[in-house]
Amino acid sequence: MIRKTSAMVEAGILAAIAIVMALISMYVPVLGAFVNFVWPLPIVICGSRHGLKWSIMTLLVATIIIAMIMSPVNAFFLAAIFGLLGLILGECMRRHLPPMKLMLFGAIGGIIALVLNIVLSFVVLGIDPINMMFTSFDESLVQLAEYYREHGMSEADIKASIDGYKEMFRMMKIIMPGAFLVCAPIMAFVNYICAKKILTKLGDSFESFPSFIMLKVPQWVLWPYFLSLLAVTYFYQTDQSSWMYAAAVNVQTVCSFSLVFQGIVLIYWYVETKKKPRWWANIGTALLFMIPLFSQIIVYVGAFDMVFDFRKIRNHR
């Protein structure tokens, strides 16, 4: 009875924290983006400490109150996207699954949640969130063109600039499925690390991830990467409207992300084994987000590491 009361009290506190986090994500612009990303944390902690039943209760209470305070739509999307991830991660942590297995289940849960969000938007609300987003992008381009005209830019320069943005938005729309696949494990990883730190402070213990510099991406990733590269090159020249072009671009996106990760690991391995300053690797990682050419170089670095095994950590038959 005492244990049940304790679980009920803790679930109530965690539900209140989830509600406060939802308010921050809604009304605090910069901090809100990060808080929104880790919104599953209270659900994860409750599930890990008290089980799936109490984490579901926490999610339901938080969702109902958020619907009353903010709006049913916001509550609906929070529960659909982040709630499911929180339930899965919480149950996996309660069972003390190995970190890599936990990440696999968390990533699958994140993908299901993102897809579920889009499907439910169609069915329940009758809206297409992706088309809505890109429609707003198109409208912003009209305003941007007017702004350029008011500031004396020539029509040729305006057209070149707007066409560049249109091409960027077109590619964003094509790679949206691949972006979901990439975003899901990142979301699961961030929430797992945060939950692990909190639960460790509360006296729990979890198996550690392998050393970062010893992580490796499966070698078979090279095959879909090179095949998608050939397919993208071919369909780019022949039929960019083909679904095969879109599929190839998404496969290339996911594989490129995996190879970039492999390249980053190799950079940190080199810095650590050669006793170089760690900020070298930090700057190299930062350059990925600033210089497109550098990110492509890191893709090739990751690919070469898979082929030649510079760290000598793979089993060779």
Please provide the spans of the model-predicted regions.
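Long, positively charged, glycine-interspersed low-complexity recognition regions
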Residues: 1-4, 12, 241-317
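Hydrophobic transmembrane alpha-helices
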Residues: 1-61, 275-283
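Short helix-perturbing small/polar motifs within transmembrane alpha-helices
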Residues: 9-11, 15, 79-125
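Alpha-helical membrane segments and adjacent membrane-interface helices in multi-pass membrane proteins
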Residues: 32-91, 301, 305
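Central hydrophobic cores of alpha-helical transmembrane segments
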Residues: 57-65, 103-110, 278-288, 301-303
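Membrane-interface interhelical loops and short interface/amphipathic helices
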Residues: 120-172
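Hydrophobic, aromatic-enriched interface-forming segments
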Residues: 151-209
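Small-residue-rich helix-loop
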Residues: 202-258, 262-263
